[in-house]
């Protein structure tokens, strides 16, 4: 809504696999930043086909047009391409070890992007980020799902022991990192984006419940999902040292802001179905 009145903003609803549409849109732009993706791991386990279509075929469509019109291209990727790490944090040169169909499609997209840089000389950059949270996140993701279920005093499903570790970053910090890379990043390079804020799932859930004044009895441990990675962690020293980026929002501040936003914007979720909150779509 804030952008809708700007002559620099235009919303086009379409599919990145539509090469004809993508061609028309890219011809007049300065750069392409590809956020478009199927991203929910649970759904990739239930049906991987939409993930292959969006995350690989869609990237191919974008790259073909980027090559044709010689545009700058930034691919948004994920820490999940590195798989689960028992210790240490993945640098940009760590080997890929994706565990889920989702992660495999994102790793495939990265290799496709790199191939267009090497083979055709395309101006490409890749960023990988850890778990995002903040306002307007789709409620199939952990943090908004917990907030919305807790608000209704409904049970909150937690996979396995709930001790899986993720590094959490507030969405504003992620966006600022992307902007920094788009402006000053080196062509052909990749940059990890992380906040060094590892927290296990059940600790996050209990923190949210505490802030909302809800009981931990809402937590319901359920069967773990297939191939559930235990720990993701990335080293973002390259981004910090070369481009001077640092995250600004700590988790306590960010999670309170996030809870406040969801509770203050009930109209945003009025059309959500109960299916959004199902926890085992592969069964």
Please state what every model-predicted region is.
Residues 62, 113, 146, 239-240:
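Structural element of the ATP-grasp superfamily
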Residues 74, 83-86, 121, 137, ...:
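Proline-centered turn/helix-capping motifs that create local helix->coil transitions or kinks
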Residues 94, 98-105, 135, 139-143, ...:
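The catalytic Tyr-centered alpha-helix of NAD(P)H-dependent dehydrogenases
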Residues 108, 112, 116, 146, ...:
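Hydrophobic alpha-helix immediately C-terminal to the catalytic Tyr-X-X-X-Lys motif of short-chain
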Residues 10, 14, 144, 150-283:
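C-terminal substrate-binding subdomain of Rossmann-fold SDR/epimerase-dehydratase oxidoreductases
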Residues 1-2, 25-27, 46-50, 87-91, ...:
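Short, glycine/charged-enriched secondary-structure capping and boundary segments
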Residues 21, 31, 50, 57, ...:
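Residue-level recognition of oxygen-bearing side chains
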Residues 1-132, 257, 262-265, 274-283:
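N-terminal Rossmann-like NAD(P)+-binding domain of SDR-like oxidoreductases, especially those catalyzing
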